[in-house]
């Protein structure tokens, strides 16, 4: 089943609700109550921890402060907690709700992450294998962008997984050209869309990670979390490949420095290029080896200063001409993933 095979998606209209009606709960029985005023969330700052190969941007210092406050409030309250809420522990009430809305994320079972593949492989990946991974990821991003004006916003080596396949080749059509891509036994998948931003039928779908108190606050500046005191900053289609390049940089840079012009490092040279900003500076490291933008500031600066690495621009580079074939050279029974014909749902 392909996205283009789905002609009627009218049932998805119910996802977006313009007028929300809150049911009358005046006659409901109170089962349990708790004063949460002493445990309000605190705003996270820009000093969040952020590894280039992960998206751990939780603010540890805020956690410490919350712990201290929790300890202090416990001392001040004395034994009031036991007396105020004793009925909650003594009288256990069970409510059976036959119909209750839930959110479910269903994921395909994959073999492992790209990070593990690179780190744990007994032999280094050949350049052609790097190229296969790169073009599969690019084609996936192109499909998402074509259908949903999509940006992932957290694409690193632990958010790409793969499954084994017996298919020797994948066939794509993009911008009128056909591509024949060797798989080397792996189909690569993008996962973890928690920070993704996309459009569906005129609606912008944006997670609360970008809320002023979210872990990705200030990466962009647009609705629904627009701050009119700062310049508008829309989602950046060059962000994903640059972010992926930053997570791959340390894996490939040694070989590039040893053999900068070797044909065996052609795909790796592409990855190094993705790590350059609009002024051709390495966005990850300074010349002295220090991080240019530590922690979450890397995300913010990629969004603001990198605009040359959108998937469509990258695919037009000479490296990918090796995959282009005439349609007549593709077997009649081959399944072509025609990105040109995918519908625009945005």
Where are the regions a protein language model picked out?
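Catalytic-loop of the protein kinase fold
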Residues: 145-181
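Eukaryotic short linear interaction motifs
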Residues: 113-116, 163, 169-170, 196-200, ...
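Activation of the activation-loop gatekeeper triad in protein kinase-fold domains
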Residues: 166, 187-196
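Helical subdomain adjoining the active site within ATP-dependent kinase catalytic cores
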Residues: 30, 220-346
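Conserved structural core of kinase catalytic domains
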Residues: 1-128, 200-207
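Acidic, Ser/Thr-rich intrinsically disordered and amphipathic helical segments
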Residues: 109, 113, 129-139, 143, ...
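Conserved kinase catalytic-core helix
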Residues: 122-152, 166
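Short coil/turn segments at secondary-structure boundaries
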Residues: 118-122, 156, 174, 201-206, ...
């Amino acid at each position: 089943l392909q996205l283009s095979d789905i002609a009627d998606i009218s049932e998805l209209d119910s996802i977006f609700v313009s007028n929300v009606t809150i049911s009358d709960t005046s006659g409901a029985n109170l089962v349990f109550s708790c004063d949460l005023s002493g445990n309000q969330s605190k705003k996270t700052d820009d000093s969040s921890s952020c590894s280039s190969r992960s998206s751990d941007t939780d603010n540890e210092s805020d956690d410490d402060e919350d712990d201290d406050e929790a300890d202090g409030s416990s001392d001040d309250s004395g034994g009031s907690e036991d007396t105020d809420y004793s009925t909650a522990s003594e009288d256990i009430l069970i409510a059976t709700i036959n119909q209750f809305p839930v959110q479910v994320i269903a994921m395909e079972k994959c073999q492992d992450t790209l990070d593990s593949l690179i780190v744990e492989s007994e032999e280094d990946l050949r350049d052609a294998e790097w190229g296969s991974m790169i073009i599969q990821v690019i084609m996936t991003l192109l499909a998402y962008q074509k259908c949903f004006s999509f940006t992932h916003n957290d694409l690193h080596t632990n958010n790409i997984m793969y499954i084994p396949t017996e298919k020797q080749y994948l066939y794509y059509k993009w911008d009128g050209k056909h591509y024949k891509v060797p798989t080397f036994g792996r189909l690569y998948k993008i996962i973890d869309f928690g920070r993704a931003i996309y459009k569906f039928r005129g609606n912008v779908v944006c997670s609360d990670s970008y809320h002023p108190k979210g872990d990705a606050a200030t990466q962009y500046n647009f609705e629904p979390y627009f701050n009119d005191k700062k310049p508008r900053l829309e989602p950046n289609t060059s962000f994903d490949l640059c972010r992926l390049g930053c997570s791959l940089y340390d894996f490939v840079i040694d070989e590039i420095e040893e053999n900068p012009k070797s044909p065996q490092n052609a795909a790796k040279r592409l990855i190094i290029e993705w790590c350059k900003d609009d002024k051709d500076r390495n966005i990850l490291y300074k010349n002295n080896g220090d991080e240019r933008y530590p922690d979450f500031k890397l995300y913010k600066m990629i969004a603001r200063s990198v605009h040359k690495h959108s998937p469509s621009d990258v695919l037009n580079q000479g490296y990918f001409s090796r995959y282009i074939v005439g349609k007549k050279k593709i077997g009649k029974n081959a399944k072509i993933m025609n990105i040109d014909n995918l519908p625009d749902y945005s």
